[in-house]
Amino acid sequence: MSISHSDTVLIIDFGSQVTQLIARRVRAMGVYCEVVPFQLALEGMQRIKPKAVILSGSPYSVIDEGSPRAPMEIFEMDIPVLGICYGQQIMCVQLGGKVASGHEREFGRAFLEVQENSALFEGVWEKGSCYQVWMSHGDRVTALPEGFRVIGTSKGAPYAAIADEKRRLYAVQFHPEVVHTLDGTKLLQNFVLKISNLKGNWSMASYREQTIAKIRQKVGKSRVICGLSGGVDSSVVAVLLHEAIGDQLTCILVDHGLMRKNEAQEVLTLFRDHYNIKLIHVNAANMFLNALEGEIDPEKKRKTIGRLFIEVFEEETKKIGGAEFLAQGTLYPDVIESISAIGKSVTIKSHHNVGGLPERMNMKLVEPLRELFKDEVRSLGKELGLPEQFIGRHPFPGPGLAIRCPGAVTREKLEILREADAIYLDEIRKAGLYDEIWQAFAILLPVQTVGVMGDGRTYEFVCALRAVTSVDGMSADFYPYDMEFLSKTAARIINEVRGINRVVYDVTSKPPGTIEWE
């Protein structure tokens, strides 16, 4: 479901790991942008009709035979173009300059000396000064195309920043999109808002209006089914669709018995009672827990839950009858990855979602969030008036508590885990830390230890606590709680939850660990 935007930046992706970061920086300025892989760049230009283009970095070498190039048309369209890292090198090569393997490779922190004032540096960096940037290159430009001048140099790159201001072509060897390049975001703002003269008037309010109109146009009088879990994405999808088509929407909450304490009831209260959304609550806990009985392999647990979810959802949809559309909370990173320049990354864990449903059920898709990043989905949720407890909540996996219960899952262990997790999150909120943490949760380990309570000996489970900080979940650091917080939280869990006599804190970063334990 594509939406038209008058001022759009096209980002051509050559496979950089930080291409999405460029897009997020541009979106944060209030300017809409799209990422397209280099193979589809020409089609993207014709479809989007961009007002500016950014060429990303890449793991490729410009020198290698068959390495990707940008369509020559972009340099002939009389629109501003910014090349970053590999993007700088192909701009130079394609316009008549030269690139060679550098004797000194630059990876990580470097320093750029500003040689000339430029519209790209205006109000940010001054001639004669030196600034920290982030480099990641082995090749480097050795000769400039006609019309370009050097505006910045570094120890390993004599042409670290270049410009042809008459044609509004700019290129840098460093990465302005990463936080390690000081004031890099301001350089991008200069390119997008000043050099390209884009207005910065794209907002969640305008996205909401345009998306509602598109939903109505696409769906017409047809009925739509939406799987609702209470997570951020499905909650925003449900409320947005309900605003667009009202009672044509029916939501299904598949309660697999693996949700957090009181979670199912909170979802029912908000969406059925407050929003008056047609919501079917399917209590399938016995089915799921019986199927999981005795299973200790985490991948098999995930696949069992995913398979049963599809079966239950499909059965409920048949009971409703007559629905033509299935709503999904597909986000923009999913879209980018599915058509990425390099291809999808290796699967570390199976992802539990409804990806297999449309084919099985012969339904059309409606994906109102497919142009948004996660932080933008939260902003849209605020625009729609969703409570903070839903839009600000930490990520929760589709398989639920089953993967926070390593080993075999039982009803008893789930109840113990629910209580411990609720106490942990309560203490985090009381300490005012919830919004500082990307994700926090308890894990009930398949290990029992000896303890002493009162005059008696205990032999009960170990509870691990996990909390991480992250920007996008791709990498994460453990949260550095003070010992007083950990001591208080551990004491509450041990005193209030029957079945736990020991609490530990996980101080593993990602990588090498993953955020979830299974």
UniProtKB/Swiss-Prot annotation:
Residues 8-201 form the Glutamine amidotransferase type-1 domain. SUPFAM superfamilies: Adenine nucleotide alpha hydrolases-like, Class I glutamine amidotransferase-like, GMP synthetase C-terminal dimerisation domain. Residues 202-393 form the GMPS ATP-PPase domain. InterPro entries: Class_I_gatase-like, GATASE, GMP_synth_C, GMP_synth_GATase, GMP_synthase, GMPS_ATP_PPase_dom, NAD/GMP_synthase, Rossmann-like_a/b/a_fold. Its EC number is 6.3.5.2. Pathway: Purine metabolism; GMP biosynthesis; GMP from XMP (L-Gln route): step 1/1. Pfam families: GATase, GMP_synt_C, NAD_synthase. One of its GO terms (cellular component) is cytosol. It comes from the Bacteria. ATP binds at S229, G230, G231, V232, D233, S234, S235. Homodimer. PANTHER family: GMP SYNTHASE [GLUTAMINE-HYDROLYZING], GMP SYNTHASE-RELATED. This is GMP synthase [glutamine-hydrolyzing]. It comes from Bartonella henselae (strain ATCC 49882 / DSM 28221 / CCUG 30454 / Houston 1) (Rochalimaea henselae). The lineage of its organism: Bacteria, Pseudomonadati, Pseudomonadota, Alphaproteobacteria, Hyphomicrobiales.
